[in-house]
């Protein structure tokens, strides 16, 4: 798992320093705060202390990166939790990697999309930019669930569609190889 997380950071860092898919982010000041928000992938389950993607991203970017990952979380829970995390940390940027547990549990993807949309709207209303990271469906080819592209287009987000899919298909990033 730690190789997967390290690969995630290596692929995320250039994005945070520039642009993606013709959308740009405001530069993050040295004192700026990045909120890595999501489930077990964000929390770093399976990685040693200091090896979660938020920890490695903080080291590489020299920015404050808050690890707001909650193992086992579904988007309905994340929607509520974000309203508590944002006033506590005042992030400039949110890396939103959420919905994998919804997919694994076969929850209604329309509801997942609604919860993610509410999180994005809340973040924007409170002055934070959002980078949306796509989560693969449960299928042989690990294609990203279409709701992520729809949300990215609707909210004009920087979107990383295939990051997890690409990492999951690459044996180099698997800790159990």
Each model region followed by its residue ranges:
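Serine-esterase "nucleophile elbow" of acetyl-processing enzymes
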Residues: 21-74, 79-90
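Bacterial N-terminal signal peptides that target proteins for export
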Residues: 1-9
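Flexible, glycine- and charge-enriched loops at secondary-structure boundaries
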Residues: 6, 71-75, 109
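C-terminal motif of bacterial Sec signal peptides marking the signal peptidase cleavage site
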Residues: 16-19
């Amino acid at each position: 798992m730690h190789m997967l997380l390290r690969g995630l950071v290596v692929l995320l860092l250039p994005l945070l320093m520039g642009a993606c898919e013709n959308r740009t982010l405001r530069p993050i000041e040295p004192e700026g705060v990045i909120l890595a928000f999501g489930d077990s992938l964000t929390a770093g389950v399976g990685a040693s202390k200091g090896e979660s993607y938020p920890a490695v991203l903080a080291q590489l970017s020299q920015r404050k990166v808050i690890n707001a990952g909650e193992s086992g979380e579904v988007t309905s829970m994340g929607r509520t939790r974000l309203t508590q995390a944002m006033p506590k940390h005042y992030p400039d940027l949110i890396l939103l990697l959420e919905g994998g547990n919804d997919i694994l549990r076969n929850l209604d993807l329309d509801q997942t999309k609604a919860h993610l949309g509410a999180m994005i709207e809340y973040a924007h209303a409170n002055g934070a930019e959002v980078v949306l990271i796509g989560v693969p469906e449960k299928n042989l080819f690990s294609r990203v669930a279409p709701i992520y592209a729809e949300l990215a287009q609707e909210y004009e987000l920087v979107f990383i569609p295939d990051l997890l899919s690409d990492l999951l298909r690459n044996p180099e990033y698997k800790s159990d190889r």
